[in-house]
Every structure is written in C-alpha cells, then in structure tokens.
Amino acid sequence: MKFFMVVSALFITLFGHALAQFDYCFGKDTERSQTRQFTTKSAYQIIKGTNIDKQYLVPHCLPQKIWIFHRHGTRLPSRSIIEKASRLEELRDAIVKNYRVLRTAPSTNALCQEDLIALQMWKWNNSITPDMEEYLTSQGYEDLRGTARHYQKLYPSVLLKEYNNTYYLFRHTDTQRTTESFKAFTDSLFGIHNDAVAEKLPEKDKLLRPYDYCEPWAANNNDDENSEVNKYKRSVLWNDTLMEISTRLGFQYTLESKDVELMYDICRYEQAWQVDRTSVWCGAFTPPQVTVFEYAEDLKYYYKFGYGSDINAHLNCRIVQNMIEHLGSNALPNVQVFFAHSAGLQTLMSALGINKDDRPLTANNYQSMSERKWKTSNIDPFAGNFVAVKYECNNAPMEKEKVIFFLNQNAVDLDWCHVGLCNWSEVVQRYEHIINTDCDSYYCPGVGALSAKPISIAVTLLMSAIIYLINLI
C-alpha cells in the first residue's frame, strides 16, 4: 500500500504537473489563427480573400481598365533587428536554461516539449547580414508572382500576356524590394525573359513617397510620451501581458518590453518567410497575447498612416488623382501598376475612406474595438494590394460604367456602392474634393504656415525694436 502511494505521488509529480502546464502548443496547433493577426508582417497567403473568383464576375459587364497599387512582397527585417540576432540567441539560451536547469517553468501555460525543443535548436541564419536590410525574400518574390498570376487568370482580356509599353505602365520606388517585386510581377505576367520596363524614377517621388517631402507629417510624432500607443504600453493590460509571457518562458521577473517585442517581431518575420512551416518564436505567445500586441500595432499605424491624423488622408492626393484619371480615360495605357510601401497603401485607404471606424482607436478602448475595421493585418500584409477595375456594362438601365475596388482579393464594400459594385459617376462625385484640388498645397497642409513662421518671428522682433526706439525718443 505504501509502495502504491509513493508510485502514485511520483506519477502525479512527473506527469500531472506536465499535463497541467502544457495548455497551449504552437507546434501542435493546426489552425494557428493568430498568424492572421501579425499586422504589417502578416503573410499574404493567410490574409488574401477567397471569394474573388465570384466577386469579379459582373453580369453583362466587361472589364476595360485596371489600376493596381501593390505593396512589396515579404522582406527581411530592418538593420536594427538583424543586428539584434545575438540578443535573440541570448534569450533562447536563457529560456532553455529556465526549463532544463533552473526548473522555473510555470505550473500552467508553459511551453510544450515540441515548442521548447524547436526553440533550443533554433539558430539565426548568418547569411542575413545588416547590408541586406529589408531586401525582398524568395517568398516575397513568389508573393508577387502569385498575385500577377491570379489577376491575369481573372482578367485575361485586360492583363494581356504580351508586353507593350503603351498598353502597360509600371512604376516602383527606389528600393531593392519594390524593384524586385516589379520584376516578379512582370515575370509572371509575360514570362521570365520579358522586356518590361518601369517608368524612370523622378528625383523627388511625390507620387509614391509623398510622406518623404512633408515636414508637418514627419513632425506629427507618434512616438512621443502622450501618443495613444505609448499610453497603451503603460496600461495594466500591456504590462500584465508582458508578465504572462515572461512567466510562460520561465523567467521569475518581467522581461523588458523591447526583448518581448523582438521575439514577437522575429516570430512574425519567420512565419511570413516560410508560410508552410512554424516559427519557433511564435510558441512564446498564446493567441490572446498576440491579440494584445496586434492592437498596439494597429494603434501605431492608425495615427501614423490612418484616420488618427487628418494629414494622412491628404498625403496620397496625387495617387488618387492618378487612379481616377486612368480609369476615366479612354486612352492608353489600359493597365497601370505601382509598387510601393505600407505608408502608401495605408494612406491611400485613408484618402478613400476605406475601413474607417465610427470611433477612433485609443489606448483605453481595446475591448470595445475588437471588431474594428482598422486592422492592418487585413489592410496591409506583405504584398498587400489595392486594385480598381473599370467595367463597361451594356445592359445597365442608367449607368453603363461601373467600378469594383479590391483590397487583398476582397471586394471593398463601400456603403455607397451595391455589394462592391460602384457607379463610376458616384466614384467621381465621392472623390471630387481630391480630383479638383491642387495637390501641391493639398497633400501637405501646414507647409505654408511652417515656412511663414521664421518670417513672422522676424517681423515681431522688428516691431519690438521699433517700439523700443520710439519709447527712447
């Protein structure tokens, strides 16, 4: 009897404890729904729509023109993250030591053996060096080949397989990742040995990078102490989440936010690089914890590129005018494709009023905004794209010209359109305030005021001097 009790106690100690602690296992999770919440580092294959094969068909209508704004495909991290590879290795070793040596794994919600072993075996890819920062990856190349192939399948009468420099217009920014994205897209459209060329890069690219030339936008600092994202990162929710993650990893103190965010970043990058495999670092986070991190990112981008600041809706004045002019013209080219960045795609959505919530996102409304429209995971994943297709409809009783907008292969359901199908005249009316404006002054409001400030100061000083002299007399 005594022997039985000892064995039972040993069994409970060894196995009962183990069973209790393995609550969530990323390696065994076949759904991994949280990978759809990786914001701007989400993999396109996970985010893209699945109903476009039905949505693009419009009875009695034929597609005539296509306009595409395409974010580059999956890329490598920034230099700052690449240079922290050694810190990731230190964190890996510390976590393994917590579990294998110090035995400080929590009694519940600990890493499962699969995730722990995978983390123990993880090594940084030393071929990724700082000089390769933000380069397009092989997966990023395939992202763009995939979107080109799919859109050409849907619209073969517009996206012709033969390249013609008057029929097609391509343009990209001055970066490796957008240049290579252009090459991947055109390789898929026309075959590998094609002669497609992009428009010459201007000295100042105010069409695709307007934010580079707008000082008031740059001065609208989203990183100051009182920004919503920084207030959120001082909240009980955020700090409790950091503590929970630290405990899950076996630490008996709360890790610094920068270390947890580094692990989260590499989790998202690695998952996007190899969609069909798992990033070992994603095992550090439970799905609810990812949701907390997702909101922090959405807050940041809401104020940096979205509806949180009025100036964001002005920045892409030129690209909106370009889209409307292209779709409204009967002249060539019939296809225009632009390859750019997150800032461009998100500010374009702000200019067009897409995915706009009735209430602003703030540090205090995390719970009530769980069903928000502004989710950068859905708006701006790697290879995110916004497509406008112009149709000519012969059987339409009133309006013969129609447009469908697609965001990442989902028809955009604007409340003034009919299940995604918009009357062209309504499109022109809705964006008339942008179409008829002077973008030089509209895109960057406040330039005049900023340039006038030194003058006004000089005038004030001059008047003060005059008054002083008069008083002396």
Model-derived regions, located:
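Cleavable C-terminal sorting propeptides in eukaryotic secreted/cell-surface proteins
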Residues: 450-473
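Signature for phosphate-centric chemistry
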Residues: 20-169, 173-448
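Positively charged n-region of N-terminal signal peptides that target proteins for export
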Residues: 1-4, 471-473
